[in-house]
């Protein structure tokens, strides 16, 4: 197994651990609300009966169904949401392209051949003064890669290819799907925890129901921080994987390092907060300058890239 493959395997284990934690918390919240709904006398016994379907866990099932429906809706509209608010252009190889558009398309084809992939993401150019890029799509069949015009103008050929390789790696690793699911689960968990503190709480006099209420009250306080930490950890792990994937496809870590340095310097020297207001795609960006970012620091990403044995 190569160094790259080991990194991917390790990060997949970490990802699975975080996803398992998310699902466990999600189910636990639903079961607590169900315990309150049935006015449980003993919380432990009630949870066991709900988990073994001796008592039907109505709220828990409804939560999972709602999550599933929202995910389906997002699958149909996610790409348009990610591109919203900007002037953008599809690079359509069946039409006449500019020299720069031709170059970008050729770079993508080279990477697809190198990775032995049999799908071609749609390529978009976003007319924007900031340097950034992102990938979107539920799976390979509806995937896209978007690059800002400033990024295309200021990076050299190898740096641009490395950025496309980074975004292509996100698609290969199913990162967009993962980010979407985690975000939806987080929001539903927070909503249910918050509302359940005020609903189902009427005259619940049994000790089990009151204990469930108390646990939900505590979760209402700590869940925002817990989900933020889990999302940051998960997303940062995926960024390291995508950086490694770019270096692997390029057979060189230097172009990705140079691209990250240039993008970081651009955000250091300019304030783009009022220009780029699409918060939905902040977690999907190649670079995120916020303090509590879903991305690792540029310094850590470069250090990690320099350790890669290509």
From Swiss-Prot:
It is found in: Cell inner membrane. The keyword Hydrolase applies. Belongs to the peptidase M48B family. Keywords: Cell inner membrane, Cell membrane, Hydrolase, Membrane, Metal-binding, Metalloprotease, Protease, Transmembrane, Transmembrane helix, Zinc. Its cofactor is Zn(2+). It is a multi-pass membrane protein. This is Protease HtpX homolog. InterPro entries: HtpX_protease, Pept_M48_protease_HtpX, Peptidase_M48. It is an enzyme of class 3 (hydrolase). It comes from Helicobacter pylori (strain J99 / ATCC 700824). The active site is at residue 167. The chain crosses the membrane at residues 16-36, 55-75, 182-202, 214-234. Its EC number is 3.4.24.-. GO terms for molecular function: metalloendopeptidase activity; zinc ion binding. PANTHER family: PROTEASE HTPX. It comes from the Bacteria. Binds 1 zinc ion per subunit. One of its GO terms (biological process) is proteolysis. GO terms for cellular component: plasma membrane. Zn(2+) binds at residues 166, 170, 239. Its main location: membrane. NCBIfam families: PRK02870.1 (NF002775).
